[in-house]
Amino acid sequence: MAKDPGRVLIFDTTLRDGEQSPGASLNLEEKLAIAQQLARLGVDVIEAGFPFASPGDFAAVQRIAQQVGGDNGPIICGLARASRADIKACADAVAPAPRRRIHTFIATSDIHLEHKLRKSRGDVLGIVPEMVSYARSLVEDVEFSCEDAGRSDPEFLYEVIEAAIAAGATTINIPDTVGYTTPSEFGALIAGINQHVPNIGEAVISVHGHNDLGLAVANFLEAVKNGARQLECTINGIGERAGNASLEELVMALHVRRRYYNPFFGREEDSPTPLTAVRTEEITKTSRLVSNLTGMVVQPNKAIVGANAFAHESGIHQDGVLKNRLTYEIIDAQTVGLSDNRISLGKLSGRSAVRARLEELGYDLTREDLDEAFARFKELADRKREITDRDLEAIVSEQVQQPEARFQLKLVQVSCGSSLRPTATVTLLDEEGSETTGSAVGTGPVDAVCRALNDLAGVPNELIEFSVKSVTEGIDAMGDVTIRLRRNGALYSGHAADTDVVVAAGMAFVNALNRLVAGEERQSLHPQKDPVVLESRPTL
């Protein structure tokens, strides 16, 4: 059997695989804020990014290693393809963390070997020990992944895994890269690895899976029953295509059904010892932070963290819950950090009160950021009687979300009505502080604002999504606007909140434009899609 740490290790890849969601790109400060909250949540490993992809990705992983990694903190991990350049960049990026890991991978399925890598099985069997051994010479903790393991020939998979462990891999990850397998198949795959890889006892078995068929969480839970002891997942299940296995669903399934899973860990059924180290009361806070910073809205009926997860509409259900919550609720909402209690702030609230509440919500702002957030808070408090947690989250998300500003919105004015043609006048500041003003007409005030901004910026793009939601209840609620722009096949999101949704739309559009410009300059590699040259392999 594989090495058993006695519980399930939670490997969070929100900052790497989760960020690959279309339009979910994060800047350095956003990544740092999420990493700090993941540490509070109690995850075991944070995969902070793909350091070789770009200088920005390298800097983000390095900064997280410096500020979040610690002797008692999470392991800080970076992803690297099976190449010396990737692995060396990864080692350098995670070096500041006392507990660090290199996660390297290569595909093992025939379809990937033939069409993506153009390599033979023999080539892969030569590359794996060489690259794992090189990674192990740089760090003590090396994870190796067999990309597309779910569609790989099991016998070949066993050979590759055995070679990786012999070369020094301490964790073996089995990805269902395209979300193809069913729970019984995935469980059998893990069981087969335990049975047929002679040295599997020297490594922890990890699993990684995508949700293309909606089976990722079910697959993982079946894998746990068959010996997997590390689960690679993301907050809110975000990720490429249909997303990844959801951290909150996995953790709460193991928490609520602990008596069922305990025997698979050799425990008594009634053992009260948690199966993960996650602090479940931090789940809701973490979910909201990730949603706010990525702009990926959580669907209302999403398990555990959706707005309706603890709501009851049916009269029969409401009656039952009022008499005894256990009639229709298997989870106490407070267990995941959802509470009806709230501290309302207003225009008389001071800086210390705002700072304290932000810290409780998971935001650790610098003095400069706090000053700006407090100024924004006071401005909002003049227009809105009561400032709620969701208002604060919107303010700070907007604050820390700002990419390096190529453009800055100074003025928005609109005229519209039933007998008027919607017209907008906007003023933009460029990075040198020069002002330009322009006007445009549109089908509505928001369309007019976006057209005017586009004309001034001169950055070709296609607006593919505009959405607005109310941050809180009431007629004075802030409107949270998300705008997504597309250019050269890449998506860029902008978000902003204001009590005036037209102003918020202008701010969100400029935010998206700044991200687009920064993204064009960044030109990141994609770990699974970009080619790699292996310097030491003459046949490649």
Curated annotation (Swiss-Prot):
Swiss-Prot/TrEMBL catalytic activity:
3-methyl-2-oxobutanoate + acetyl-CoA + H2O = (2S)-2-isopropylmalate + CoA + H(+)
HAMAP family, sorted = LeuA_type1
- What's the protein name? 2-isopropylmalate synthase
Which compartments is it annotated to reside in? Answer: Cytoplasm
Pathway, per Swiss-Prot/TrEMBL? Amino-acid biosynthesis; L-leucine biosynthesis; L-leucine from 3-methyl-2-oxobutanoate: step 1/4
- Its predominant location is cytoplasm
Any one Gene Ontology biological process term? L-leucine biosynthetic process
Question: So what does this one do?
Answer: Catalyzes the condensation of the acetyl group of acetyl-CoA with 3-methyl-2-oxobutanoate (2-ketoisovalerate) to form 3-carboxy-3-hydroxy-4-methylpentanoate (2-isopropylmalate).
Describe the subunit structure. Homodimer.
Domain Pyruvate carboxyltransferase, by residue range, is 8-271
Positions bound to Mn(2+): 17, 208, 210, 244
EC number(s) on record?
A: 2.3.3.13
Report residue spans for region: Regulatory domain: 408-540
Among its keywords, does the record have DNA damage? no
Q: Which PANTHER family match?
A: 2-ISOPROPYLMALATE SYNTHASE 1, CHLOROPLASTIC-RELATED, HOMOCITRATE SYNTHASE-RELATED
Entry-linked Gene3D superfamilies: 1.10.238.260, 3.30.160.270, Aldolase class I
What keywords sit in the KW lines? Answer: Amino-acid biosynthesis, Branched-chain amino acid biosynthesis, Cytoplasm, Leucine biosynthesis, Manganese, Metal-binding, Transferase
One GO MF term? acetyl-CoA C-acetyltransferase activity
The text of the family note is:
Belongs to the alpha-IPM synthase/homocitrate synthase family. LeuA type 1 subfamily.
Which Gene Ontology CC terms are recorded? Answer: cytoplasm
Give the originating organism: Synechococcus sp. (strain CC9605)
